[in-house]
Amino acid sequence: MTPIVDFQIAARNLTRHTRRNLFLGGALAAVTALLVLLGALTGGMEAAMMESATTLLTGHVNVGGFFKITSASTAPLVSSYPKVLEEVRREVPEIAWVSVRGRGWAKAVSESTSMDLVLGGVEVANEPTFPRVLRVKEGRLEDLGQPGTVLLFEGQADRLKVRVNDVITLSAPTDRGVNNTADVRVAAIARNVGLLSAFSAFIEARTLNQLYGLNAATTGAIHLYLEDPSDAPAVASRLRAGLAKAGWRVMDPEAQPYWMKLMQTVPSEDWTGQKLDVTTADDEMGQFKQFILALRVVTAFLVVILMVVV
């Protein structure tokens, strides 16, 4: 048969089975649309989670550390951080910007109730992504730059029953075994950002240092934001080697968030003084990365089901 005859036969079959062909074409179009929608939804959720996490929780690469007065005591501190930052800038020319963050934990007490908070000490003027990620419901984000201020999330403010300009008391254990307290004013209340905002609050950096009795050259971690986030593993490896060569003691890489090391790993290690800990966003995100992986698995499973249906 000639190609023309084949084409004529195919055309007659299509015209004789119009309803079936329309149904099949509609099913293919619907499944294709669902696959595109599912991919866009998954990609959007993952991108939003990563942006929120790398704003509130971690940098692309982090230079944190632990300071031990005795082998049994541990504090998440980086002493003499300006010197560390100077070496970091030499080793990592790919840095887009740097955020210096204090790390702490405190019990927040209002007039009616209390709750535990993980505190991040920030200099809000040096946090370019805060205005994009944090949606302020009450107050002004800029006011977090004033001494003695704290930013709470909506769920925390509801639980503590406080509003902007109310005062709460923070009680925090220090590495010397005593509890310090500080009265802080609620400068702003931001809308919740999922699980990330359930336990974290932000306090003006100098206020956090005063709460813990730390000097101005001490911080919790240096968050590095890179021009290309995919370079983070290579940058972290290079930075560990560079800091060790420059004379700092550097911990071996371990894919755990700092708070797990603080509670489980470091207290049992027999050393004192300062050690630096270089991590990536994947290391610090821990369970959040597991959630993203589960989301990808569910997406792949749904794609297979849709393809089988077709």
Question: What are the roles of these predicted feature ranges?
Answer:
Residues 251-308:
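Peri-transmembrane interface segments
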